[in-house]
Amino acid sequence: MSRHEGVSCDACLKGNFRGRRYKCLICYDYDLCASCYESGATTTRHTTDHPMQCILTRVDFDLYYGGEAFSVEQPQSFTCPYCGKMGYTETSLQEHVTSEHAETSTEVICPICAALPGGDPNHVTDDFAAHLTLEHRAPRDLDESSGVRHVRRMFHPGRGLGGPRARRSNMHFTSSSTGGLSSSQSSYSPSNREAMDPIAELLSQLSGVRRSAGGQLNSSGPSASQLQQLQMQLQLERQHAQAARQQLETARNATRRTNTSSVTTTITQSTATTNTANTESSQQTIQNSQFLLTRLNDPKMSETERQSMESERADRSLFVQELLLSTLVREESSSSDEDERGEMADFGAMGCVDIMPLDVALENLNLKESNKGNEPPPPPL
């Protein structure tokens, strides 16, 4: 391919540009075309002192290195992201970083990941030496075949190795980076006709797919374990919450029981106090009544007072007796008066003179005088 497909210059904003591509190893996702890099384009975050990794298209690589005979293990040229020195291979870059920048902890972008197919073009790491030893060791996986290993080492984004086989349509394939970041698509072809054949390419593709699937499984493994840990934590929290609720309920029940017992005890105490008060009051009243009786029974009056009281009582008794006798005598006298009047009437009938008592005669005289006063005067003569 003659273009950096999917990549745009961050200075002139030209997309899918031709020529050399310069990727900053300090700034995240920052690419420049050749003209902007040579003119010294800078921004607020990017300066000309930042190390840049040069990436070529396949056409430019064939143009620059087409006449040279490269072995299978011929490395690419990488730039140190710390000091900016160029021309390192994978092994020499690892040796340089471990010897010169072992204690440096600045966050940089791995130039090898940006150049390898399927790698992260913006992989940021703060321990570049450990990243190189873990991810970009010189002896590749031993379980892979030599052809597959050669394909992995010779594949490079934006580059292709020379030879007439590189231009055959059935011997190259395209790859693109993921994540929406700056990427490049290019065709790949082997350098030796004997070493590489279509079966080896298919095997290399299958191994790449297996590696990507294994990486995804490895990346998803801790997430599943984290989910399990979270579930266990949630279950423990729920158990703790239930235990706390049970403790609260037991405490509430205990407080309610104590309150009811205290209420009953207070009621019994109040009833006992009222009963005791009532008994005390009744005892006091009994004692008071006893005291009154004793006071009445006690002889406190003098002899003269007693004699006067006895005389008064005797007089009263005599008066009552006289009243009773007088009433009885009046009834007998009234009956005797009626008998005498009957006898006087009998005497009158016999022609005897009626003898009036004096009070009756006086009453008759008074009646006659009053009648005379009430009579009208006689008519004049």
Curated annotation (Swiss-Prot):
Modified residues (Phosphoserine): S2, S169, S189, S212, S335, S336
Residues modified to N-acetylserine: S2
EC numbers, comma separated: 2.3.2.27
Recorded metabolic or biological pathway in which this protein acts: Protein modification; protein ubiquitination
Top enzyme category: transferase
Zinc finger (ZZ-type): 4-60
Residue ranges that the Swiss-Prot or TrEMBL entry lists as coiled coil: 224-257
PANTHER family: E3 UBIQUITIN-PROTEIN LIGASE KCMF1
Recorded family membership: Belongs to the KCMF1 family.
Protein's recorded name: E3 ubiquitin-protein ligase KCMF1
Organism field: Bos taurus
